[in-house]
Amino acid sequence: LTPQGWMKDGSVLISDGKILEVTNSDLAVIGAKVVDAKGMSIVPGFVAMNIHGGGGFDFSECTEEAFHGAVAAHQKHGATTIFPTVLAPEIGVIDKAVTVCEEMMRKKDGPILGLHIEGPYLNPKMAASLFIDKENPADPKEYKEILERTDCIKRWDSSPEIPGALEFAQYLKSRGILSAISHTEAEFD
């Protein structure tokens, strides 16, 4: 698959893990290892942006073992870039996730580019499956304390009807973090 669409037959030249050339013809490179991919598809790596775990592991466990296990499961199926989604019924879960994520992001060429947080500023009527059973107003002291010491959070979901959620979204935007609406009773209007 190329930006121009599907290519029926052709060759891909890879050196040191980088694609050097994609062509409709056969490539003859002296000393190159040839992999016959007839009947297969070659596609760019997948970006997993809302992924809670995999391979029997849950990112919300907030352990290196869970992160490694889930990442390995997704890499096996073509994900090259992963934004682990962590369900956070309370702010302490985010602290743990940040610690593990920062460690994983220190690894050169690692697949994790940042965290996606769901909670705790969600409508409890719409987030019961996340173990959020009470309204948690978006507390600037709480979220600023976390965001001022890390840059690994790339997306943070909240329900706009929660007190303080609009200010929270504006703060996220000011820091270059994607603010997403989630688990809400809000309507389009």
Regions found by a protein language model. Give the residues of each.
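Active-site mouth loops of central-metabolism enzymes
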Residues: 53-65, 128-136, 178-180
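Histidine/acidic residue-rich metal-binding segments in metalloenzymes
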Residues: 136-189
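Generic structural signal for well-ordered alpha-helices
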Residues: 71, 95-102, 143, 169
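Divalent metal-dependent hydrolysis catalytic cores, especially in the metallo-beta-lactamase
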Residues: 52, 68-97, 111-123, 150-161, ...
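N-terminal metal-binding scaffold of metallo-dependent hydrolase/deaminase domains
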Residues: 1-28
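Divalent metal-coordination and catalytic microenvironments
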Residues: 12, 17, 39, 50, ...
